[in-house]
Regions:
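Sequence-level detector for compositionally biased, low-complexity segments
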Residues: 2-213
Length: 213
């Protein structure tokens, strides 16, 4: 049985501040620059970008065709060339760690492509409701916005990969240092919800969302 998630909380103020800063950058990346954007700290507003000399690029010969006849059906990766192929097109400068990047055990790029490829049908498993007819309403060719989305995603994944050594180092230092216990957090009332976040009590004359019979 897999143990539950455990989050070590450092009692070292400096390490805590470092973790906060790192967390802000992760959220900035996950939200494509919409949250925690602070230009002076290297987090400008808008889609995050890798340095030009290492950012993914699509050369003239790698442009993904927008012809219905060339709608991509496959996504593949060439390790030697660090090239990501989408149908007949391709993107250069894609590191192996970006191609293999997973979230919850699923390869991000394969998942992303599965919702944009020519055949998007998925098998009905168990008692799950059959797919809606609305799922058949889709473009019959590769859209320019798909390419933009792909470049944005590759940049974000690349920047997340770059953070991994820093995250691992910080975690090691946090675990090796003093930690806050659940007892200390409770004694400091750190786990209590502030009154403003609690649901308001129902006043007289107000109807409940769920009416009683």
């Amino acid at each position: 049985m897999q143990p539950g998630l455990r989050i070590p909380l450092t009692a070292d103020p400096q390490l805590f501040r470092e973790a906060v800063q790192l967390g802000r950058r992760v959220i900035w990346l996950h939200t494509y620059g919409e949250r925690f954007s602070t230009p002076k700290e290297g987090r400008p507003k808008g889609p995050p970008r890798l340095p030009k000399d290492s950012a993914p690029r699509i050369p003239a010969k790698g442009v993904i065709s927008d012809s219905p006849d060339a709608m991509p059906e496959t996504i593949t990766y060439d390790l030697a060339q660090q090239r990501l192929s989408i149908g007949d097109g391709y993107v250069e400068r894609v590191p192996p760690a970006v191609w293999n990047y997973e979230v919850s055990g699923k390869q991000v790029l394969r998942q992303w492509f599965s919702y944009r490829q020519k055949d998007r049908e998925r098998p009905v498993m168990g008692d799950r409701r059959p797919p809606s007819k609305l799922e058949e309403v889709q473009a019959n060719h590769w859209l320019a916005e798909y390419t933009t989305d792909l470049i944005d995603l590759l940049n974000v994944l690349g920047l997340l990969v770059e953070l991994e050594p820093q995250q691992a180092d910080l975690l090691q230092r946090v675990c090796a240092g003093p930690l806050l216990s659940i007892t200390e957090l409770n004694e400091a009332h750190a786990l209590e919800l502030p009154a403003a976040s609690l649901p308001k009590k129902q006043g007289k004359g107000e109807q409940s969302l769920f009416a009683e019979d």
